[in-house]
Amino acid sequence: MKNKISQFVILFVFISGSIFAQEKTIFQKNGVAINGYDPVAYFTDNMPVKGKETLSFDWKDAKWQFSSDTNLALFKANPEKYAPQYGGFCAYGVSENHKSPTDPSAWTIVDEKLYLNYSPKVKELWTKDIPSRIKKANDYWVLIKDSKE
């Protein structure tokens, strides 16, 4: 009986550790998505705009910051419309089957979706064949979204 309890405890610890070890599906630093940039501003202002700590919203275990009350309201009403693809990880990196951090100034909007890249140089690689990269990234994201960075 003691042996079965020990086996159960070991199994429980292993499973719990696996569950809690999973990384978040949103790229964030100190719990803040997009390095504190306003995701809506990419669409409305056509440029990255730093959000304010006082205008924030928790979504998918990350804090999203906004530059205006209007942008905050737009995001709350439809976060999937404004949140970057692949959880804000580098779109090019995901198309290469790995997660990479992003630079908020390296971005594109394609078919009303926001894509971020690791750097302006990586964005250049991304823009050489965006349709193919999106297809690859969509396929890989399903497999890697819950993996460690």
Regions of interest found by a model, annotated:
Residues 1-24:
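Bacterial Sec-dependent N-terminal signal peptides
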Residues 22-149:
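Charged, low-complexity intrinsically disordered segments
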